[in-house]
């Protein structure tokens, strides 16, 4: 009764990075019953939409790392964020000399890669075919990109995601028997939260507005 007395638009709900889907769903239903549109599971402010599942999951699966013949990393350090996945990348690089490029902060990933820069222009150059690595992607049968929270939580994260999707389209990363567009999450609950659309309802506030 006390919560209800505040009115739905004056309260908000946030889901933690380790929350289970059942708890998030129950909280979402409670907020809906109170007329509250302000909820978010993206505590880090990641610019991800819940509308298209293929736009926020790791589509190729970890096994897809073994199949790819070129890899673009965007705003991610898989050695720190996903060590098992990084080991698979290293294995492909070691056995097949997998060509790898990174857009983002340079780091020791335990394998060789080409650092393309750390901004939207670097990604745009790949989309427009103005960088030599664009030819590598275009010549590949199963090109892959992995975009991480280091890119998606930036102020221009939405633009970076849109450009990454454009790179994916230009270089045929998504075809009938292959989907090389991957989002690497650092929060265990994130995909589940997006699956049940634990995001602002129409007219609702997201994490940034809730915190201000």
What is the predicted function of each stretch?
Residues 1-212:
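Catalytic alpha/large subunits of respiratory electron-transfer oxidoreductases
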């Amino acid at each position: 009764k006390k919560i209800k007395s505040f009115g739905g638009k004056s309260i908000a709900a946030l889901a933690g990075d380790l929350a289970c889907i059942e708890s998030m769903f129950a909280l979402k239903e409670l907020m809906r019953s109170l007329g509250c549109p302000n909820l978010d599971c993206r505590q880090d402010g990641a610019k991800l939409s819940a509308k298209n599942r293929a736009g926020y999951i790791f589509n190729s699966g970890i096994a897809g790392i073994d199949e790819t013949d070129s890899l673009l990393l965007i705003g991610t350090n898989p050695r720190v964020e996903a060590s098992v996945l990084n080991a698979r990348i290293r294995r492909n690089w070691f056995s097949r000399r997998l060509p790898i490029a990174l857009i983002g902060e340079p780091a020791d990933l335990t394998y060789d890669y080409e650092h393309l820069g750390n901004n939207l222009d670097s990604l745009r150059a790949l989309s427009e075919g103005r960088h030599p690595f664009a030819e590598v992607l275009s010549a590949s049968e199963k090109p892959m990109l992995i975009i991480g929270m280091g890119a998606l939580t930036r102020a221009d994260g939405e633009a970076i995601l849109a450009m990454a999707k454009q790179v994916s389209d230009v270089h045929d990363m998504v075809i009938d028997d292959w989907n090389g567009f991957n989002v690497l999450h650092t929060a265990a609950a994130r995909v589940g939260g997006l699956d049940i659309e634990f995001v602002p309802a129409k007219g609702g506030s997201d994490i940034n507005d809730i915190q201000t």
